[in-house]
Amino acid sequence: MVAFFLAGWYGVLMFIGIAIFAKFFLESVNYMEHYGLVRIKGSPVELHHSWNTNRRISSILLYNVTRHSHHHEQGSLEFWKLKPKENAPEMPYGYLTTLYLVVFFPWLYRRMMEPKLEHWKDHFASEGERQLIA
């Protein structure tokens, strides 16, 4: 309603376009943050249930969303208090590079993540999570 009063139908179209882009971006990031990881239903969310990265540019531009594992550990912390976690699964690149691959080259992203998923299974997954994967 506000968009229409401010800019007419053009404002409404812009509002809808921005909303669609924002939703696509949010879901792409969510997909990337949890890609291929499993958790036993009802078990607590832990550090190893999301991908982490400590790339400086991504951290600055995306308000530390790169410290996603710490957010899983302590969801109520403000973004500026999120710290890198050494014992969390690590993305091969920063969020911005990885997101570009997810959106435009999904087959390349999957191939790039295969060794990371094997490492996760061998070093982070619980026995129950390994059984879910098998």
Named regions from a protein language model:
Residues 5-13:
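Transmembrane helix interruption/hinge and helix-loop junction motifs
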Residues 15, 21-134:
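Cytosolic/stromal cytosol-facing helical appendages immediately following the last transmembrane segment
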